């Protein structure tokens, strides 16, 4: 567990390091993106948050999110919030801590070997979760789940997934279907970039045509077999 006062002191010292925070306006788009991720990794490594800092004593997480490092580089805020609060927070609060895949993804994210994403917003409905069109169908033959984006308006927009070479995993909000029964919106654990940073099979990414969003874009899932990990918060067999 990180002591908040000690953590605040370390992060304050880090924020004074001008070498860590270059002027991004002097860099090309790809360089800006990779620089932000380098800063993210340095700041997150300095914080070294554990499970208890995210779901039990939240003071270290709040200390991180209130750090002056975020005023030096505003792009840190969504990356840190997505990784710790949304992705890891969901896995730790709702995930089955005895399931080997969930255990593995938590360990990878805490060690910063993968970056966590949270895919909710859709191109056609924004954050209106009840209108969400991304679907997961239960496959009784394999006791697994198949994730699919049925049309372009259901593309998740705009997750931090477009940058190549970055291992990433995600919590995807999708509508669960069991046969013809609509079982509502549930979160699913879905890796989207492998250890080499390549897109996983069944995942595609499109870059926005107009907006200058260097590492964001629309993501789709094409009949992606999401394994037999049950919806987060739902016990296997329930």
Give the location of each predicted region.
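Sensory/regulatory domains in signal-transduction proteins
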Residues: 120-128, 153-156
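Amphipathic, small/basic residue-rich leader segments at the start of a protein or domain
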Residues: 1-115, 126-127, 138, 144-146
């Amino acid at each position: 567990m990180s002591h908040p006062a000690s953590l605040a002191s370390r992060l304050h010292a880090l924020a004074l390091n001008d070498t860590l925070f270059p002027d991004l306006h002097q860099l090309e788009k790809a360089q800006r993106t990779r620089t932000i991720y380098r800063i993210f990794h340095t700041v997150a490594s300095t914080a070294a948050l554990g499970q208890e800092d995210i779901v039990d004593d939240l003071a270290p997480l709040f200390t991180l999110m209130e750090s002056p490092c975020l005023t030096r580089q505003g792009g840190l805020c969504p990356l840190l919030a997505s990784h710790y609060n949304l992705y890891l927070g969901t896995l730790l609060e709702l995930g089955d801590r005895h399931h080997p895949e969930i255990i593995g993804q938590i360990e990878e994210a805490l060690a910063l070997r993968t970056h966590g994403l949270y895919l909710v917003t859709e191109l056609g409905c924004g954050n209106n979760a009840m209108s969400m069109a991304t679907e997961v169908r239960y496959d009784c033959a394999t006791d697994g789940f198949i994730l699919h984006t049925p049309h372009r308006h259901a593309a998740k927009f705009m997750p931090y997934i477009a940058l190549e070479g970055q291992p990433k995993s995600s919590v995807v909000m999708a509508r669960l279907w069991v046969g013809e029964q609509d079982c509502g919106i549930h979160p699913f654990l879905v890796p989207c970039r492998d250890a080499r940073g390549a897109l996983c099979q069944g995942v595609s990414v499109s870059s926005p045509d107009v907006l200058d969003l260097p590492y964001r874009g629309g993501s789709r899932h094409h009949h992606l077999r999401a394994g037999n990990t049950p919806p987060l918060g739902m016990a296997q067999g329930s």
